[in-house]
Amino acid sequence: MFYDDDADLTIIQGRKVGVIGYGSQGHAHSLSLRDSGVQVKVGLKEGSKSRAKVSEQGLDVDTPAAVAKWADVIMLLAPDTAQADIFKNDIEPNLSDGDALFFGHGLNIHFGLIKPPAEVTVAMVAPKGPGHLVRRQFVDGKGVPCLIAVDQDPTGKGEALALSYAKAIGGTRAGVIKTTFKDETETDLFGEQAVLCGGTEELVKAGFDVMVESGYPPEMAYFEVLHELKLIVDLMYEGGIARMNYSVSDTAEFGGYLSGPRVIDAGTKDRMREILRDIQNGDFVKKLVANVEGGNKQLEQLRKENVEHPIEVVGKRLRDLMSWVDRPITETA
């Protein structure tokens, strides 16, 4: 684990950093780098709606190609599925020996969708939290833990550069963990697919379906399997699984011990291993690339099917009654 004393901020302060993208992580990195005394420019395509926001926040903005030509450290924070084209069209033609190409996630490097020249340092700085939290913690004098990894290191100084960058966005205040592009990518994808997004979503929908099919009102089913999930996850987030079990009733704890293994059993773990193998051998990324090349038709169809599930209909109606719940723009419009 690395902390503030292990990183030299002057290293990144002596470089010119181009941040490509201004989404959740892009804005947090750019603003915190600037506040740490680093020269920063943001790369966005002509016509991007985010350009005005970048200028309003006092940052310089230009096209990705122009920023890549100006910078000697390029942090690529555009969506995973857009990165390969941005690299090919805007970044690669403007790379020079000694430049560094940074990522916030290892997918494109690990699976060979982006292949930088051997003379370029390739590293990753990945905060383990959303951009708004990274920025808020930085402003408060704190930080969010980060992962760093170095994939190509022609100068032998890649790790020091990555640590310096992590320090500039507050990561070393909390702690920085050294990893590899392989481990970060595969664990991140597995967590998303098997547990955080895919697994949790399907568990919630299955619980809702069983209750409604058994004759219970959909409103009650929604509260029991989705609305209250936040209460449980917050307890686990704050103090682990043991804290959650300590905080719930004895009835809930006892029932969970008995019934949880009936839902998530050895067969579930076998299927999780299959998901992990699909990630490790590149099958998932092949499907991801095929979807993009097909105009995102498969993703759009899956999205359509998902929003039409009854839990989404009853959920929107119930959230209309909850003044304390922050509503997304897409739902309030």
Curated annotation (Swiss-Prot):
Gene Ontology biological process terms, A to Z: isoleucine biosynthetic process; L-valine biosynthetic process
Binding residues for NADP(+): 22-25, 45, 48, 50, 80-83, 131
Domain KARI C-terminal knotted: 180-325
Active site per database record: 105
Gene3D superfamilies linked to this entry: 6.10.240.10, NAD(P)-binding Rossmann-like Domain (3.40.50.720)
Annotated positions binding Mg(2+) 1: 188, 192
Cofactor note (record): Binds 2 magnesium ions per subunit.
A GO cellular-component term linked to this record: cytosol
Binding site for substrate: 249
One Pfam assignment: KARI_N
Protein family according to the UniProt entry: Belongs to the ketol-acid reductoisomerase family.
HAMAP family to which the protein is assigned, alphabetical: IlvC
Main function: Involved in the biosynthesis of branched-chain amino acids (BCAA). Catalyzes an alkyl-migration followed by a ketol-acid reduction of (S)-2-acetolactate (S2AL) to yield (R)-2,3-dihydroxy-isovalerate. In the isomerase reaction, S2AL is rearranged via a Mg-dependent methyl migration to produce 3-hydroxy-3-methyl-2-ketobutyrate (HMKB). In the reductase reaction, this 2-ketoacid undergoes a metal-dependent reduction by NADPH to yield (R)-2,3-dihydroxy-isovalerate.
Record's protein name: Ketol-acid reductoisomerase (NADP(+))
Gene source species: Mycobacterium avium
Lineage: Bacteria, Bacillati, Actinomycetota, Actinomycetes, Mycobacteriales
